[in-house]
Amino acid sequence: MDRLRGPDALTVPVDLVVASIDGVEIPFVSHLVAGKIFGSNFVAVMNAQWIGNRDLGPRSHPGDGLIDITTGSLGWRQRREALSRSATGTHLPHPSLTYRRVRSETLTFDPPASLRIDGALRLKGRTLSLCVEPDAFHVVV
């Protein structure tokens, strides 16, 4: 711990994403997933590159001021292939997936979607508004 207070410590800025889910604001650092990854009408919102051992945000960086969003709907064969390729981030580009990098976005789900935030919080939502707060905090490593 003393190293973190010394000259060898590195301080890096990290973006915070604020998700407004049906009007309730929930900040997150890493990711938000609506539905099953690569399932029917899924959405992956990435502020970091990885979810577990899957490289779902191959261009995403927690300090670039952008949110990486992948949306789409894959059949079971394409889903298996995309899941396999996501270990190396080579699932993109894909003709059935839309990928974009934005500062803010609003998505609507009908019916409400199951949402998982940073791998922990689970809830349902119909309207999802996202915005990034660049350099919201600093991490010392």
Regions found by a protein language model. Name each.
Residues 1-58, 63:
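Catalytic core of DAGKc-family lipid kinases
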Residues 67:
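Glycine-rich phosphate/diphosphate-binding loops and the adjacent beta-loop-alpha structural elements
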